[in-house]
Amino acid sequence: MRINPTTSGPGVSTLEKKNLGRISQIIGPVLDVAFPPGKMPNIYNALVVKGRDTIGQEINVTCEVQQLLGNNRVRAVAMSATDGLMRGMEVIDTGAPLSVPVGGATLGRIFNVLGEPVDDLGPVDTRTTSPIHRSAPAFIQLDTKLSIFETGIKVVDLLAPYRRGGKIGLFGGAGVGKTVLIMELINNIAKAHGGVSVFGGVGERTREGNDLYMEMKESGVINEQNIAESKVALVYGQMNEPPGARMRVGLTALTMAEYFRDVNEQDVLLFIDNIFRFVQAGSEVSALLGRMPSAVGYQPTLSTEMGTLQERITSTKEGSITSIQAVYVPADDLTDPAPATTFAHLDATTVLSRGLAAKGIYPAVDPLDSTSTMLQPRIVGEEHYETAQRVKQTLQRYKELQDIIAILGLDELSEEDRLTVARARKIERFLSQPFFVAEVFTGSPGKYVGLAETIRGFKLILSGELDGLPEQAFYLVGNIDEATAKATNLEMESKLKK
């Protein structure tokens, strides 16, 4: 159903013949609504409650039908607070699922779960809307070609490459550079692939969402002077929202991303932070609807809900949605049903390490813990695979030797091990790289490094050709030529000091 969000508001369609019901029961965010016989709304239809509360304040609450109870009653979950609602209030069945604005007009804007802008920049300039509940693409529409999604970030492209149209889990605590990595990916995808990004804040801290918005404006990902030039649309359903909103905000973001893929035929990057909160909200709604809890108190429909969301994130013959999802692991237990269900859908994992961040190596991606199903010789080619394996072996050997170095010192190592350590330290530093979005903080210009350049650089380090260069020459540079140039500059500086 095509509706006009500028006149009727996103998420609400105007029907000539209104189907009216009345509230019969309110339990927190859950409403029971009675409709006339034969006029029952469908599951997932949006219902709207309009009116005034006891002190005359205007009420406008949108709900989503979840269950048909019999006796002409339905049970719906509210997408905003139900304060002020009373039994007997009139409810309008919109006759369609929640619909949100889609297309280029959404870029640079912040939306809530209903697709309403919340950034005080006025209404969204589009008449095109799309329902948030859709089927996953049909089997014949899928693009099964295995191709690497080049990010321009050396450590990711070499050791844990992303799949075009794949799903990536981003594991990291606070302060290790997760936000900066997300912003750099948004920036690089826009430049290298002409792509756009959609960020879905699911059950986030409001402060973090605000920080991300401010940093995006500062780094130019969102262009304040010309909003149309922005590269990202933001959709937020924060921690303080009712569970219905937190459960559906991921679908709102996904719907906006699907339009860019299917209609604009673009490569889209979809960020979901945090996928665990999506599961958590589903668990709350499940309990409110009276379903029997399953393992560890989660909803019995956990796998279905996760699958419904994840199966829509895929590559078609038109374009692709590549999804990067932050994954919170409750009590660091990877066997918990929420992360365990998420793992089944992931193609790659990018693990951020506090140890590397403490050393000042950014991006602080752990080269040994991060994994990818794409790192196979038949997909990435023999040269890439061999280089990646040798880099990992060198770093692993360095890790094993660190205890010996700490106790006895470098001098006690064999000649071969000393060489391995020297190369590993160069590799560790060469895995760092200056980011475009961090230019304002570091003062050094950002670098996008192509995959071929990345492989060439690491092959040169492993071959021993660069053993004579100081390790600081490899820190925060782009390709290997910049490292050799930096080494020459360092040598000249030291001569001048003498």
Swiss-Prot record:
Membrane topology summary: Peripheral membrane protein
Listed GO MF terms: ATP binding; ATP hydrolysis activity; proton-transporting ATP synthase activity, rotational mechanism
Reaction equation(s) it catalyzes: ATP + H2O + 4 H(+)(in) = ADP + phosphate + 5 H(+)(out)
Keyword flag Membrane: yes
Compartment list: Plastid, Chloroplast thylakoid membrane
PROSITE patterns assigned to the protein according to its UniProt record, in alphabetical order: ATPASE_ALPHA_BETA
Keywords carried by this UniProt record: ATP synthesis, ATP-binding, CF(1), Chloroplast, Hydrogen ion transport, Ion transport, Membrane, Nucleotide-binding, Plastid, Thylakoid, Translocase, Transport
Sequence similarity: Belongs to the ATPase alpha/beta chains family.
Subunit structure, interactors included: F-type ATPases have 2 components, CF(1) - the catalytic core - and CF(0) - the membrane proton channel. CF(1) has five subunits: alpha(3), beta(3), gamma(1), delta(1), epsilon(1). CF(0) has four main subunits: a(1), b(1), b'(1) and c(9-12).
Protein name per Swiss-Prot or TrEMBL: ATP synthase subunit beta, chloroplastic
Lineage: Eukaryota, Viridiplantae, Streptophyta, Embryophyta, Tracheophyta
Gene name, Swiss-Prot/TrEMBL: atpB
